């Protein structure tokens, strides 16, 4: 039954895939809080700038994990995706993770019909079927692989429909669809493996919540969008 529901989900959204960026024309920003073990430790903000068929999505992320007052893990990142209509033209990011610099420089190669990537973990090309692994876009639920927005590495994934649910975020109830996003190869080391629960608000075409466990229980939750 789940396989049938999953097929119907992809069938429904495949007809709308060319209008993907149009779903976000109404947004100026999406604000997510980052929580670890129930405590707010940072934020993940997305800002949208539109000019005719051109859309720029700016991503700002920052969080830090402390233990007995000492910072044991921290990340600060800035990224920018550029689209013409529904086509990703370029993506660039710079990230500071535990005093280490990481980056991605991606651009569309029209001649070869692929992406050219130069990143801190991967340099080479990638199929246009890949998506940037950011939480603002529901296309991540339709893709077979994603490009890390921090390092440029390519990760194959499997998305499974769990069911329809109701969740409450900041005093407001939403009807959502619950998905599980995992690595295609689950034998990968845990720190390299994708293993996320995702709650998607179909009405607003918005991922409202993401949860995973790694050195604690993490949540990304949409606090505000406008």
Cite the ranges covered by each PLM segment.
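Acidic, serine/threonine-rich low-complexity disordered tracts
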Residues: 20-109, 139-226
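Alpha-helical transmembrane spans
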Residues: 8, 133, 137-139
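Sec-dependent N-terminal signal peptides
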Residues: 4-13
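Hydrophobic, well-structured mid-protein blocks that either form specific transmembrane helices
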Residues: 93-133
